[in-house]
Curated annotation (Swiss-Prot):
Protein name according to UniProt: Tripartite motif-containing protein 59
Organism (species): Mus musculus (Mouse)
Quaternary structure (record): Interacts with ECSIT.
Pathway: Protein modification; protein ubiquitination
This protein's encoding gene: Trim59
Tissues where the protein occurs: Moderately expressed in the spleen, brain and heart and very highly expressed in the testis.
C-alpha cells in the first residue's frame, strides 16, 4: 500500500477515513468505528452520568467523552480536507476495490487469499475473516514464486512434453493411414468403375453383333418377299391392261403372263420361324452377374450370344381326340420313355443350373465360372435339340400310322 494512502486509512476499518474524529489522545478514527467500539465496551459510570469512558483502540488509554457520545468529539478538519482532495485526484498506481467505490485494496484476507478493502471486512463478504497487512503478507509469500517455478520444472512436466510429442507423432501417423486409405478407396473404385465400363462395352458390342445377326437373318427374306410382291403387282397391272387389248395382242401376251404367274406361285416361300437369342442378357445379369463377388467381376466372362431358329417346344397341343387316342395306343411305350427322358433333362436343366448358380457366387473361381457358363449354354442347346428331335420323331411316327 502507498505510504500516503496508509496515513489516510482508519486503523479499525482499514478504509479511507469517513467523518474522522479526534480523541483527546490525538488518535483519529472514523465516527462509525468509534460508535461501534463504544457500543461494544458498555462501560458507564453511575456516579458520573454526564461522562462516558472510552478506551482508545490504538494506545489503549481511557478517555471520557460527553454524554452526547461520539458526536461530541471534534472533527479532524485538516485530515478530512486532505482526504477530499486525495479522492478528487486520479491515482493510477492505487488499486481500488471493484465492489466498493474508490476504496483501496489495502488488506490481505488470509482465508480467501486475496486483497480486500476495509468495506469488504466490515460490511462485505469478508467480514470476520483473518487478515494481514500487505507488507507482512508480501514477505510471507515472497519465496512462493521460486517454489512454484521449481515445481513447474520437475520431471512431471518433462513427461508431459514427451507425451505431447508422442501424441503428435501418433496423430500424424494415424492421419497418414487415413489419407492412404482414402487413396486406396479412390483407386479401388476407379478400377472397379473402369472394369464395369469395360464390361458394359463388351455387353453392348455383343448385342450389336446379335443385331447384325438378326439383320442378316431377316433382311434377305424380307427383300425376297418384297420382290415377289412387286412382281405380283406388276403382273396384276399387266393382267388388267390385257382386257383392253385387241384379240391379236391379247393372245400374244396371255400365255407369257400365265407362265409368269405360275412361276411366281411356284417360287418357294421361306418358312417363317421366329429366332431365339441365347443367352438373354437380362438373365445373365440377374442370375449370374448379380451373384458374382465384386473382386471377380474383372475376370467374369461375357457370354457368347447367338441367334438361332426357335425350335418347336416339347409339348403337344393337338385337340383331336382320335389322333391322341391312336397315338397313345401305338406309341405308349415310346411316349413313356420319352417322358422320363424329358423330365430328367428338364429337371436337370432347372434345378442343377440353379444350384450351380448359387455355388458359383460362393466358391467358384474365375476358371470354373467360365466352364459353368459354357456348360449352361451347352445344356440349353442340348435341351432344345432333344425337344426338336422328339418333335420330328413324333411327326414321323404319325405319318407312318396315318398311312
Amino acid at each position: 500500500m502507498h505510504n500516503f494512502e496508509e496515513e489516510l486509512t482508519c486503523p479499525i476499518c482499514y478504509s479511507i477515513f469517513e467523518d474522522p474524529r479526534v480523541l483527546p489522545c490525538s488518535h483519529t478514527f472514523c465516527r462509525n468505528c468509534l460508535e461501534n467500539v463504544l457500543q461494544a465496551s458498555g462501560n458507564f459510570y453511575i456516579w458520573r452520568p454526564l461522562r462516558i469512558p472510552l478506551k482508545c483502540p490504538n494506545c489503549r488509554s481511557i478517555i471520557e467523552i460527553a454524554s452526547t457520545g461520539i458526536e461530541s468529539l471534534p472533527v479532524n478538519f485538516a485530515l478530512r480536507a486532505i482526504i477530499e482532495k486525495y479522492q478528487q485526484e486520479d491515482h493510477p498506481d492505487v488499486v481500488t476495490c471493484p465492489e466498493h467505490y474508490r476504496q483501496p485494496l489495502n488488506v490481505y484476507c488470509l482465508l480467501d487469499k486475496k486483497l480486500v478493502c476495509g468495506h469488504c471486512l466490515t460490511i462485505g463478504q469478508h467480514h470476520g475473516h483473518p487478515i494481514d497487512d500487505l507488507q507482512s503478507a508480501y514477505l510471507k509469500e515472497k519465496d512462493t514464486p521460486q517454489k512454484l517455478l521449481k515445481q513447474l520444472t520437475d520431471t512431471h512436466w518433462t513427461d508431459i512434453t514427451r507425451l505431447i510429442e508422442k501424441l503428435e507423432e501418433q496423430k500424424c501417423h494415424s492421419e497418414k493411414i487415413v489419407q492412404g486409405d482414402k487413396e486406396v478407396v479412390l483407386q479401388y473404385f476407379k478400377e472397379l468403375i473402369d472394369t464395369l465400363e469395360q464390361k458394359k462395352k463388351y455387353f453392348l458390342a455383343a448385342l450389336c453383333d446379335v443385331g447384325k445377326m438378326i439383320n442378316q437373318e431377316y433382311t434377305p427374306q424380307i427383300q425376297g418377299m418384297k420382290e415377289i410382291r412387286e412382281q405380283q403387282l406388276e403382273l396384276m397391272t399387266i393382267t388388267t391392261s390385257l382386257q383392253d387389248e385387241s384379240p391379236l395382242k391379247f393372245l400374244e401376251k396371255i400365255d407369257e403372263v400365265r407362265q409368269r404367274v405360275q412361276m411366281l406361285k411356284q417360287r418357294p416361300l421361306p418358312e417363317v420361324q421366329p429366332v431365339e437369342i441365347y443367352p438373354r442378357v437380362s438373365n445373365v445379369l440377374k442370375e449370374e452377374w448379380s451373384r458374382i463377388e465384386i473382386g471377380r467381376i474383372k475376370k467374369a466372362v461375357i457370354p457368347e450370344m447367338r441367334v438361332s431358329s426357335k425350335r418347336t417346344p416339347c409339348s403337344w397341343s393337338d385337340n383331336d381326340e382320335k389322333e391322341m387316342e391312336l397315338f397313345k395306343i401305338l406309341n405308349i411305350a415310346i411316349v413313356s420313355l420319352i417322358s422320363v427322358i424329358l423330365m430328367l433333362i428338364l429337371l436337370f436343366n432347372h434345378h442343377i443350373i440353379t444350384f450351380l448358380n448359387e455355388i458359383t457366387s460362393i466358391c467358384f473361381s474365375e476358371v470354373f465360372l467360365s466352364v459353368y457358363q459354357s456348360l449352361s449354354k451347352n445344356l440349353y442347346d442340348l435341351n432344345n435339340t432333344v425337344c426338336y428331335t422328339l418333335y420330328l420323331l413324333k411327326e414321323f411316327m404319325w405319318k407312318i400310322v396315318s398311312r
